[in-house]
Each structure stands twice: as C-alpha cells, then as structure tokens.
Amino acid sequence: MTMMFDLTQDLVKEILSRVPITSLGAVRSTCKGWNALSKDRILCKAKPKQQFHQGFMLSDYRLRSMRFNISGTFKENGEEFVNLSVKEIGNFLNKVEISHMYYCGGILLCVTTDTRLVIWNPYLGQIRWIQLKTETMYSTFCLRYDNNKNHKILRFLDNKQGSYEIYDLKSYSWRAFDVIPKWDIDDDGQSASVKGNTYFRTIDETPNLLICFDFTAERFGKLLDPPFQHGWMSLSWVREEKLVALYQHLDTSMIEIWITTKIEPNALSWTSFLKCYIEQLIALDFWFDIDYNNFFIDEEKKLAVVIDKVESEDCKRSNSHINSYIIGDDGYLKKMNSLGNTARSYTAIMLSSCYVSSLVQIDDPIARRRRRERNSKRKEKKRKGTTNNKV
C-alpha cells in the first residue's frame, strides 16, 4: 500500500494545487512536509500544471467557495470542456445571513444582514468579530492594506455625506475622518482593490467616473476617466495587480473589456482586452446583470467568465437561476454550468477569482494565547499518556 511519504514531491504539489479553498487548513495538519509545501503554495513558489481560478460567491445570503478551470476550455478533439464547482461553506458563516463580502490578499470581510462585521482567514481558520463605532442603517465597506501590509477597513457612513471611518486590524480601533466630496460613491458594490488601493465607481453628472482611496496615505485621489462613459460598467481585477472594466453598450450588442497598463492613485491608462458583438443578446432581449463584481478574465486564454442572474419566467416562482457564461472575441458566447438558484430580491455576487491563501494572523492576541495554551496542554497530556503506556 502506498503511504503519503512514498509520494513524489511533484505529485504532492499537484495534489495541493487541487485542494479546495476551505480545505487548505486541514492540509497543514497532515504532516510537516505537506505543511511546508502548502506554505510554498501561499508564497507562489509552487506552480501547478493546471491553473484554477478560485474564489467566493454570495447568493441567498450564503457564502460559497467557487473553483473554475478554463485552462482546458477545449479538448484535443475540439470538444468544449470546463471544470466548474460551487460548494457551500460548512462553518459558522452559514449560521448567519451575509449581505456583502469583500476580499483582500487571502482575507475576507463579511457584512451580515444586521450590519455586523466579521473578518475570516480561510486558510488559518481564524475569525474576528469587529464592533462598529457608529450605528447606522446602511454602510458601505472595503478591505485593503497599506504599504506595511497592515489590513484596514474603510467604512462609508451613509447618514452623513462625506463621513468615513477606518478600522486598523493591528491597533483594533476605529478612527473617523471627514471629507467634503464633490461626488457620491456608488453603493451597489462596484469597487476593485489593486496594489494597496481601492477604486470606486462614483455617481456624478458624468457616469462611470472612478476615484481611488489610498490606504497608505488614507485619502481620496482625483476623479479618473474609464475608457468609456455611457452604458453599464462592472469592475474586477487580475492578481490584485491590474484593474479590469467590463462595459456593456445600452443600444448595441457590443461588450468591451478593458485592462489597465498603468495604475496609480491619480492616473490610469487602459488597453482593450476583448471586444465582441454578441448578436444573440439582442435577439434574446438579454443583458448581463453587472451591478456587482461578477466577472473575471483569463489573460492567457483571452476569455472572460461572467456570472449572471436570470429571473424565472414563471411569475409564481420567486427563485432566479445563476448561470455562468464564457465570452471571447468574434462574438463567442457559451453558456456553461448552472450555479443553482437565488432569491429574486438579491443578486449573486462574484467576489474574487484569484484567491491566494494568507498567513496573516487576524484573531486577537488573547485568543491566540489561549489556543497555544490548549495545544500545549493536549501535547503534554498525550506525552504523559505515551509514557504511561511504555511503563
């Protein structure tokens, strides 16, 4: 019988590359070698043969992990092939209703329907509940880190225009600051975090303008132009290094996707990544629901995956279908696997397609000390039991 230590290192790396997000923590406890290799994966030292897009999706106020492989979109015989799976997360997060979620460098910020905040590191299995400084009916949040890799939460207080708060995970404290804005932030979730900064879509006389919040300087930049003005726009990102914008024309069947070649707090340069006329969209009177970050791209394959909600044609049914589509050049549109159903009143959100595990400790020092003490007691009890058995 083949034992774990009989496996070659290349085979182990390939196995680790296929481990679901929510199971990474269990790998660490298998053996010291696997723990070390899993850390290599986190530090991007190990490159699997097949590149999987991993991320999270929210529907019906429940968080789900998502795994998508489009590196094998076509088999050698020309037959189309896509490996897609969505899995419910069976931990404490499915015991609460989640209205929004935000991702940054392997850390998730979840907002419950009763406006409680919880930070989660899926790899380490650590959580932290965060007490709000100011109680309001509605708020918009985002999660990012500064140049020193200190994670921070930016909160927009909707009851006071121009009022914001910042939570520092290192100091466990909120700070308030006021800005006199000439714009309003779009509160429908349209933002993307790249290189330590977050770019928001603004609501102004000119639609689709962007503005950056610098988490190191803790200030907003100037208004930035996207590569287009009119139509429906959704934002995404690539490896937290490039900003991506999907633009859907209002009066034609054209879909455009642009990607940044230069990205700074006060300057953006764009290049066209994909442009296609999808005639069947007009024929079907169909438009992608892109109110949220629900698409991602594969630069190598020059394809985009869009997650979309389609309302049921049966008026007696309250559910809508969540579908996935692959779009490419020359009008290529392919409907892929169904991702299940969701309540009509809430749109599914595609959070991130480039999840990378993190070793950042997010639980508080007291909880960490108690955990170490429990582990130490278990080891001591096990050692004494082993000694007694030998006697």
UniProtKB/Swiss-Prot annotation:
Q: Where is the composition biased (Basic residues)?
A: 369-385
For this UniProt record, the keywords arranged alphabetically read as follows:
Kelch repeat, Repeat
Matching entries from SMART domains are given as: FBOX (SM00256)
Q: What InterPro entries does the database record attribute to this sequence? A: F-box-assoc_dom_typ1 (IPR006527), F-box-assoc_interact_dom (IPR017451), F-box-like_dom_sf (IPR036047), F-box_dom (IPR001810), SCF_F-box_component (IPR050796)
Which residues form the Kelch repeats? Answer: 100-143, 144-194
Every copy of the F-box domain together lies at: 2-49
Gene3D superfamilies, per the entry: 1.20.1280.50
- What segment(s) does the record annotate as region Disordered? 369-391
**Pfam families attached to this UniProt entry:** F-box, FBA_1
Q: Give the protein name, as stated in the record.
A: F-box/kelch-repeat protein At4g05080
Q: Which organism is it from?
A: Arabidopsis thaliana
High-level lineage: Eukaryota, Viridiplantae, Streptophyta, Embryophyta, Tracheophyta
